[in-house]
Amino acid sequence: MGSNAVKLGTGAATGMFFHAPSGTALPTYPTDTLGSDWKEVGYVAEDGITWHHGRSATPLKDWSNSIRRMLQDDATGTVAVPIISTTKEVLETLFGSGNVTESAATSSHGKLEAVEVKEGVISGEEAFLFLMKDGDDTIMLGTTKGFITTLDDISFAPGSAITWGATVSADAWKLILDDGQVTT
């Protein structure tokens, strides 16, 4: 096994984190040109994304305490994503497009983005896609139906980027790795 088996999860320079309406088909290959429904959300912080593919199960045991069957309790996967862009697209992704309004610049203020934060409300379902690149290798992680289920605390401090830490949750994820070695 060579060193090429060790992959880096570096975000693709031309886009890293995308969203589209729920049910939008994922690309077949990580290098495919994305359809017009896919919109780039924003820059991901240097720590990258964290995929948690968790499942839990309850063992069913017989009288001798031997496991006879496993009942699956939960199988939701999550991606934690720290977003360092502060744009209308980011705000709409995190808080829902119906909760973000934009006002044009006037003689008394610049262009305004206003967010109505409704606690306890989860934004609607969407398709999500993360693209990574390491040399010729490309990696794609996506879901056709996911939700932003948690938002981390947001720090507004001098000397550091405003980071919108979000968790995308979905029942089904697709991971594709392409070594980039095409045949002729």
Residue ranges and their predicted role:
Residues 52-80:
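Short, solvent-exposed beta-alpha or beta-beta edge segments that form flexible loop/patches at the rim
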Residues 135-184:
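Mixed-charge, glycine-accented linear interaction segment located at domain edges/termini
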Residues 30-31, 42-43, 50-54, 139-147:
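Short amphipathic beta-strand/extended segments with alternating polar/hydrophobic composition
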